[in-house]
Curated annotation (Swiss-Prot):
Keyword ATP-binding belongs to the record: yes
InterPro entries the record matches: Acetyl_CoA_COase_a_su, ClpP/crotonase-like_dom_sf, COA_CT_C
Gene for this chain: accA
E.C. no: 2.1.3.15
Catalytic activity: N(6)-carboxybiotinyl-L-lysyl-[protein] + acetyl-CoA = N(6)-biotinyl-L-lysyl-[protein] + malonyl-CoA
Species name: Ralstonia pickettii (strain 12J)
Full protein name: Acetyl-coenzyme A carboxylase carboxyl transferase subunit alpha
């Protein structure tokens, strides 16, 4: 698949287009231009390194939304085996913006749950662009409770702009569904390992992300609101999204410094979409390390640790004024 370049990546796009053009010419030419192609390829790689070493929070937000970025089912195919998808919330409907089911991780039975956005227009509409309704969160809750019943560790993958804000979702109890999920996750007797793989948007993300360990990909985001939404509220225009992204502190390194996530998994040069298989390999290693941390831990110890973790959020110190 041809790489889609973001607006701030246009200098890289121009170089890659030139390289592609030279490769096409070389196929029908007796002149050897492989040296020039190699030179431009090295230049493109260095430019990518320089650009990605100095990303702004707004640029990171754009990478997190990249249309070719790996989604939950992409990681499921690469990381897990024997995946068997389970459907429906047993109350209203089957929300396809959340996928989940039984699988094996390194041979061990587990439960996998995650947001799924969709690749083309038809699938995006079918999956509601990854914005879940109450039935999606209730499906996730059902699968968590099933895993808890059979003693299976839970892996969740977060990638959503946020919970669906439609009237029908509110009528069916959107906030109650999210709140109930938080209640269930707090009391699980099995470990839950959450990974932010793209957008982590507000309560819609938190509804499946209250893990014993929270992992975040290098160019993923996690915030209470989207930069555009924040800008529209504070400045009455979405054009201030870059400033809002800076103020929200939505990047992995900022959140790690605040103690809100536990681990950052570096992405391949240019983002996860440039090399999905390598990204999946690195993430699988991180998931295995996190799971080992909780294996053999008593239920009481696991729950006590989780309680301490949750109670530690929002701590602050007061300093005397001068």
């Amino acid at each position: 698949m041809k790489t889609t370049f973001l607006e701030f990546e246009q200098p890289i796009a121009e170089l890659e287009a030139k390289i592609e053009e030279l490769r096409f010419v070389q196929d029908d030419s007796a002149v050897d231009i492989s040296e020039e192609i190699s030179r431009l390829a090295s230049k493109s790689q260095q430019l990518t390194k320089d650009l990605y070493a100095n990303l702004t929070p707004w640029q990171v937000a754009q990478i997190a939304r990249h249309p070719q970025r790996p989604y939950t089912l992409d990681y499921v195919r690469e990381i897990f085996t024997d995946f068997h998808e389970l459907h429906g919330d047993r109350t209203f409907a089957d929300d396809l913006s959340i996928v989940g089911g039984l699988a094996r991780f390194n041979g061990q039975a587990c439960m996998v749950i995650g947001h799924q956005k969709g690749r083309d227009t038809k699938e995006r509409a079918l999956r509601n662009f990854g914005m879940s309704k109450p039935e999606g969160y209730r499906k996730a809750k059902r699968l968590m409770e099933l895993a808890d019943k059979f003693g299976l560790p839970i892996f969740t993958f977060v990638d959503t702009p946020g919970a669906f804000p439609g009237i029908d979702a509110e009528e069916r109890g959107q906030s109650e569904a999210i709140g109930h999920n938080l209640f269930v996750m707090a009391g699980l007797k099995v470990p839950l390992i959450a990974t932010i793989i793209g957008e982590g948007g507000s309560g819609g993300a938190l509804a499946i992300a209250m893990g014993d360990s929270v992992i975040m990909l290098q160019f993923a985001t996690y915030a209470v609101i989207s930069p555009e939404g924040c800008a529209s509220i504070l400045w009455k225009t979405a054009e201030k999204a870059p400033e809002a992204a800076e103020a929200l502190g939505l990047t992995a390194h900022r959140l790690k410094a605040l103690g809100l996530i536990d681990k950052i998994v570096n992405e391949p040069l240019g983002g996860a979409h440039r090399d999905p298989k390598s990204m999946a390999t690195m993430l699988k290693r991180a998931l295995a390390e996190s799971l080992r941390q909780f294996q053999g831990m008593k239920t009481s110890e696991l729950q006590a640790r989780r309680h301490e973790r949750l109670m530690a959020y929002g701590k602050f110190k007061e300093t005397e004024g001068r």
